Every structure is written in structure tokens, then in C-alpha cells.
């Protein structure tokens, strides 16, 4: 979902610069800009054997900036789609069938349920850590957390004797710590960027440690005041700080790490129902077993969500009032407004 952050042309050029690498996306119809960049299915033979590995790529593009999606359409697979995945693999007669999934942990579990006999799902998107993976209904599922802290290593042992068969499969999350040496070329690029003295310029002082929630609320208050709006909302993922802002001097580096996207602030005219629907639409359930994650910070009002099969919301907003709402352009662009200006 982040591959389009710099636009379709940048993604196309990036892919064209790696001619020996195959890119696969199965649940999307691509624009002319990305024509011939992706395949819906890839089969790779293992040299010296009769074994081949088939790959399907599935992605959840809900969080992709809609301004970068011109000409691209996609569907989130449902139960029938999952059932048809096995049939697609059978058509190509591969020995090993692998799904590269950016659908999230919950959708991967559904895929395991409705698509038995997939050998491996290499998953992501919801930042779940499975140190040794899950093995269910013959399918091995791998998730390795987030922030490049770990890399997944999946091992499949197979027999080349007829009939060719898989003997075992396993996966593990390997920590990318100081024991693994840095690439010298990449390390130098990072050093030149992060060593810019401008980043160390002090722009303020934090009188105490500031939590992620408080930072999000401060964002909202700032854009509410700057835009002279009635209220403000901000998406949780727009605050990129991992945990908190330390007590003491605040530098440009700190600010950049909090918000590196250069978002523009927009205002919209919205009713109580519109605002509550936006908040509920960002109340995501990453798995069937867990509750939702609050994805929207606010100022100028408060709200409460009652989790359940059908989550509901109450707020201090008033019926019959049209509010001027300030928000980042990302949040604005990724919600279909019943009423907006």
C-alpha cells in the first residue's frame, strides 16, 4: 500500500530498474502507466530439478493515497475468491504454491480456512509478529512484525523423486540487529542524510514526556487553530513517532520524525453523522479475535466507540449543525464524504 507513495511513474521506474526481479499482483487491474510491470501469476522453476514454485500476489490498497490510484482498480478477496485461489494454482501444476499477501493477518487466516493446500503465505500489512509462523490446514503462515526489525526465513524441504513432494516446511523471524553487518553503500547514504546539521536545530522545549496520543491531540489543536475551524481530526498513522517525544529540547529532527509527509491541511463542511461515520470507517479490526484500533485523534469534541460485531459511536457533536472540520489531506482523500466542500 506504500509502493505508490511517490506516484505511479516513480514505481514504474523503480521496477524497470530491476529487470531480473518479477513483480506479481493478482487482485488489481493496473493503469497504462504500470502496464507490463506486474504479472497476475509467476511460476519460477528450481534449476536442476523438476520442481517449480508458483506465486500469487494479493494486496489491500485501502490505505493507499487515492490521488496516486488513477486508472487502478482492485478488489479485496472474499470467501469465493479464496476458494478459487487453489484452482488457479492447479492450472499451473507447480510443486510449491506461495502467496505473497499484503492483506493483513485476519484476511490471511480466512485464506487458510477457505483455501487449503496452499503451501506458504508470506504475509504483512498488520504488523503482527509470528516468531515461528502458524501451520494450519497444511498452510504455513509467516508474519515478521514491522519497522524492518526482523526478516522472515522460510525453509521448504522437498523430494525430487517421483512423485515430487514436500517433506517439511518451517519459518522463523530473524532479528536484524547489530550482529548483521550494515551494507556500506546504504550506510553512507543514510549517514549523509541523517547527519544534516539542520536536523539538530532546536525549535522548542518539551516540559515533560509527551505520549503518542498527546502528540496526536496536539496535532489536532494546532491545525484547528491555524485553520480557524470548529473541530479537527487527524489519522493515527500520520503521527509517525513510535512511542513518545522525550522531555527536553525539541529539534527539527524530532518534528520530521513525527510528521515526515508534508501533509496539507484541508477543511470540510460536515454534519455530526458524517464525522462519526468517518471515525467508524477508520476503526479497524485487524483480526477476528481482537477489537478495533482507534485510528482518529480529535480536538474540539470527544467521542466513544462501543466495540462489538457492529461497532457504534457516540460523541459530543450536535445534530443539525454543520461543522468546519480541519484534517490532513491524506485522511480527506481516503474517505468518501456524504457531504463535503
Kindly label every feature range from the protein language model.
Residues 3, 73-75, 204, 256-262:
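Generic, ordered loop/turn and secondary-structure boundary motif
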Residues 52, 69, 193, 202-205, ...:
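Intrinsically disordered, low-complexity segments enriched in small/polar residues
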Residues 16, 91, 191-199, 228, ...:
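Generic surface-pattern signal
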Residues 2, 72-74, 130, 211, ...:
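Bulky hydrophobic/aromatic packing residues
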Residues 20-27, 39-41, 217-341:
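Feature captures C-terminal
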Residues 1-185, 214-222, 267, 284:
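Acidic, metal/ion-coordinating pockets
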Residues 158-249, 256-259:
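A short C-terminal boundary segment appended to hydrolase-like catalytic domains
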Residues 6, 59-62, 109, 128-129, ...:
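Basic, gly/Ser/Thr/Pro-rich low-complexity segments located predominantly at protein N termini
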Amino acid at each position: 500500500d506504500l509502493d505508490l507513495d511517490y506516484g505511479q511513474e516513480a514505481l514504474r521506474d523503480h521496477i524497470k530498474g530491476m529487470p531480473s526481479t518479477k513483480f506479481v499482483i493478482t487482485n488489481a487491474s493496473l493503469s497504462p502507466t504500470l502496464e507490463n510491470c506486474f504479472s497476475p501469476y509467476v511460476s519460477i522453476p528450481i534449476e536442476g530439478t523438476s520442481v517449480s514454485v508458483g506465486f500469487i500476489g494479493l494486496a489491500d490498497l485501502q490505505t493507499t493515497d487515492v490521488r496516486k490510484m488513477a486508472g487502478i482498480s482492485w478488489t479485496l478477496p472474499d470467501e469465493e475468491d479464496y476458494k478459487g485461489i487453489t484452482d488457479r494454482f492447479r492450472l499451473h501444476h507447480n510443486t510449491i504454491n506461495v502467496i505473497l499477501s499484503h492483506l493483513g493477518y485476519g484476511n490471511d487466516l480466512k485464506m487458510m480456512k477457505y483455501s487449503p493446500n496452499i503451501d506458504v503465505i508470506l504475509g504483512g500489512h498488520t504488523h503482527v509478529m509470528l516468531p515461528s509462523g502458524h501451520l494450519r490446514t497444511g498452510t504455513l503462515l509467516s508474519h515478521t512484525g514491522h519497522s524492518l526489525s526482523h526478516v522472515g526465513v522460510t525453509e521448504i524441504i522437498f523430494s525430487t523423486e517421483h512423485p515430487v513432494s514436500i517433506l517439511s516446511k518451517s519459518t522463523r523471524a530473524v532479528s536484524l540487529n547489530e550482529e548483521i553487518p550494515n551494507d556500506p553503500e546504504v550506510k553512507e547514504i543514510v549517514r549523509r542524510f541523517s547527519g544534516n546539521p539542520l536536523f539538530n536545530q532546536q525549535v522548542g522545549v518539551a516540559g515533560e514526556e509527551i505520549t503518542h496520543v498527546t502528540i496526536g491531540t496536539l496535532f489536532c489543536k494546532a491545525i484547528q487553530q491555524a485553520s480557524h475551524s470548529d473541530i479537527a481530526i487527524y489519522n493515527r498513522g500520520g503521527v509517525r513517532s513510535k512511542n513518545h517525544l522525550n522531555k527536553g529540547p525539541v529539534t527539527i529532527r524530532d518534528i520530521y520524525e513525527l510528521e515526515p509527509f508534508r501533509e496539507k491541511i484541508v477543511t470540510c463542511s460536515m454534519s455530526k453523522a458524517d464525522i462519526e461515520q468517518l471515525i467508524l470507517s477508520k476503526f479497524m479490526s485487524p483480526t477476528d479475535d481482537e477489537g478495533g484500533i482507534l485510528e482518529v485523534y480529535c480536538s474540539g469534541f470527544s467521542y466513544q466507540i462501543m466495540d462489538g460485531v457492529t461497532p457504534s459511536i457516540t460523541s459530543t457533536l450536535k445534530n443539525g449543525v454543520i461543522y468546519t472540520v480541519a484534517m490532513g489531506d491524506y485522511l480527506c482523500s481516503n474517505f468518501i464524504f456524504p457531504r463535503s466542500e
